[in-house]
Amino acid sequence: MPKWIRSTLNHIIPRRPFICSFNSFLLLKNVSHAKLSFSMSSRGFRSNNFIQAQLKHPSILSKEDLDLLSDSDDWEEPDCIQLETEKQEKKIITDIHKEDPVDKKPMRDKNVMNFINKDSPLSWNDMFKPSIIQPPQLISENSFDQSSQKKSRSTGFKNPLRPALKKESSFDELQNSSISQERSLEMINENEKKKMQFGEKIAVLTQRPSFTELQNDQDDSNLNPHNGVKVKIPICLSKEQESIIKLAENGHNIFYTGSAGTGKSILLREMIKVLKGIYGRENVAVTASTGLAACNIGGITIHSFAGIGLGKGDADKLYKKVRRSRKHLRRWENIGALVVDEISMLDAELLDKLDFIARKIRKNHQPFGGIQLIFCGDFFQLPPVSKDPNRPTKFAFESKAWKEGVKMTIMLQKVFRQRGDVKFIDMLNRMRLGNIDDETEREFKKLSRPLPDDEIIPAELYSTRMEVERANNSRLSKLPGQVHIFNAIDGGALEDEELKERLLQNFLAPKELHLKVGAQVMMVKNLDATLVNGSLGKVIEFMDPETYFCYEALTNDPSMPPEKLETWAENPSKLKAAMEREQSDGEESAVASRKSSVKEGFAKSDIGEPVSPLDSSVFDFMKRVKTDDEVVLENIKRKEQLMQTIHQNSAGKRRLPLVRFKASDMSTRMVLVEPEDWAIEDENEKPLVSRVQLPLMLAWSLSIHKSQGQTLPKVKVDLRRVFEKGQAYVALSRAVSREGLQVLNFDRTRIKAHQKVIDFYLTLSSAESAYKQLEADEQVKKRKLDYAPGPKYKAKSKSKSNSPAPISATTQSNSGIAAMLQRHSRKRFQLKKESNSNQVHSLVSDEPRGQDTEDHILE
């Protein structure tokens, strides 16, 4: 052992090898996982800084030092306490893959302490090579790619591991599951909680872990499911996804597509991070055709980005409108890349208008003025909304801008498998193409049975807004208790009342909102990073802002002395002053002033509802304290009484809904929902129409259009009034399996797909073949450059570098898609009814709706 280690340890624990709490090495079951966790007690141990320094710079450790990092396969659980200085979960990822130790005795905590004092070496099987240990990284930093030599970037999105996942599933199987559609997966595994119950740790992981390696044979039934340690499992991009990333890094304009479960959203989030690294954070426009799709990728609608309002009028008129807005003009001038999700719902005419605006503003005649384009979507889903019923729908790929600018059109083919229903997979694929046979029809009609009645309420999807409103109102009427009515305050400079009413319908916030305790609601505006358009929740109570201020203070500090509440209850002016101080500290004065005026105007519309006592369930968080101390119990009771007093003092004030929202990572968040404002502005940014309303809508039932992009555990779909191609497919593919799906009024004659979309998909390339063709073209270009006379050729080459030639490679898949999708055979290829089910079926992936996007789980 090196002298500096011996000296340090002798200084810390002289001649007392077993008194020190140096239980710092926890090694999990299998070496192939190579997972090493550190946790130390700060009591009686002063070398925390030493250990942290070595973790930050592991390359300076010698072989003897690294013996301490043994990967013994049967370590007893040490009695560890979390490092006080290590407050965040970190991980080290390595690419080492070691064979399981053979003929090696398990190493105990006691052996380590003996080794420290006796200077006895460990076996070489317990050693790591210094060169393969990487510096510690935060959870949100890079995670490993499929290739052991490459890194891929992870996002901050989390997704809970479904508890029904089979224990014997390997990491590779999980990697191909639809659950792995999130780049960062937050796993709380019941079988590993006891082993991981040592606080937050730094973990060494390889890219080949198996979940069977994390199993604990001991009974863990007494563990609290909410106290488990969260383990980050690196999720890898597939080879075809990496190929598309490389194409984007090379500056190419790309459209990629795929059916549900092929990882479109994961790839898009990764693509956005890559582009921001290239162009800068402010120079990448992240947009989508709809508000819900935009919030899923952290962007805004394409209309909002472009500054074109509703996009009505000719291109020149819209160009002049953008020119008058300095904010939107700068956007167009500065961006380097434009990302558009759900491109399928953007019509060709609007895309050409945007192209015209970009070329004129940037004074560049290349497509979109030289802006790099990344389009994503599935044209088999909902098409663009037709403004004129007499004019046929034109898809984005039919536009002039698309034909000139988007040269790489790619089909994602690798399916990330889940615990799926194979029969349901085939049924969805046939529905996607409008190719329903007798057997598929019989299977769908069997799904008309009611769903099991449990705590999860099925989301009801309807094709029209009227059906949605009727179903939501029916559910609301069945709830007990008082109805709270919130009327919107509408305004704006527009004098044409008919036009004004039509424009107001563009706001998701309803003109009149009826709520009760227990109502299921959806947020319809982005408020912050975790509370976004599409977040689902349940109304818990109604209270005024002053009562909520006290309630929030109490939930943040349940041990708060009751004297503080007594002061606020007896002196409402002091309570109001405390609220104003906190609000002014958290917001700029201009923002705070605007929000204050919005709230005041909304509060004046109150109709003077009677004040009902707060429900006892609101105070459940205080009742969780387990104690027999009479003083503590008396304080809890006193706090409840004071809260009721403060609430009763709010008579005549506007009471707002207290909503418990459920995030995609299954965590909950209590929020008092306050009014927000919406506006459609003119070119001078003055509101033509505006609305002040709570950003909520009833959400037992949703329209099929609003459901696109969501995954729902239980779905009830009524297809009686389906009127659009792709609408039925979107609705039914929200479900994960047949067990969670109820289908009413199924009619095969209403299940259709656009022939233009089928023809377009026959021209798509695979990602791998597109990248290979690109490499081949680059080689040809390089050879020509070697024989070219020089500057003259180089100038020509440079002028064409941003417009690569179309990729003419064929796609390849396990189902024989290569033979069908020959790009040069489009004119000769004819779809026949008898070949439709076999040939076109291979165009789509064979998975049901999984974790393609951020989950919105109904409570």
UniProtKB/Swiss-Prot annotation:
Signal peptide: none annotated. Phosphorylated. Undergoes RAD53-dependent phosphorylation in response to loss of mtDNA. Residues 1-45 form a transit peptide. Residues 844-859 have a biased composition (Basic and acidic residues). Residues 727-746 bind DNA. Pfam families: PIF1, Pif1_2B_dom. It catalyses: Couples ATP hydrolysis with the unwinding of duplex DNA at the replication fork by translocating in the 5'-3' direction. This creates two antiparallel DNA single strands (ssDNA). The leading ssDNA polymer is the template for DNA polymerase III holoenzyme which synthesizes a continuous strand; ATP + H2O = ADP + phosphate + H(+). The keyword Transferase does not apply. Monomer in solution. DNA binding induces dimerization. Associates with mitochondrial and telomeric DNA. Binding to mtDNA is non-specific and the protein seems to coat the entire mtDNA molecule. Binds to the telomerase RNA TLC1. Interacts with the mitochondrial single-strand DNA-binding protein RIM1. DNA-dependent ATPase and 5'-3' DNA helicase required for the maintenance of both mitochondrial and nuclear genome stability. Efficiently unwinds G-quadruplex (G4) DNA structures and forked RNA-DNA hybrids. Appears to move along DNA in single nucleotide or base pair steps, powered by hydrolysis of 1 molecule of ATP. Processes at an unwinding rate of about 75 bp/s. Resolves G4 structures, preventing replication pausing and double-strand breaks (DSBs) at G4 motifs. Involved in the maintenance of telomeric DNA. This is ATP-dependent DNA helicase PIF1. The lineage of its organism: Eukaryota, Fungi, Dikarya, Ascomycota, Saccharomycotina.
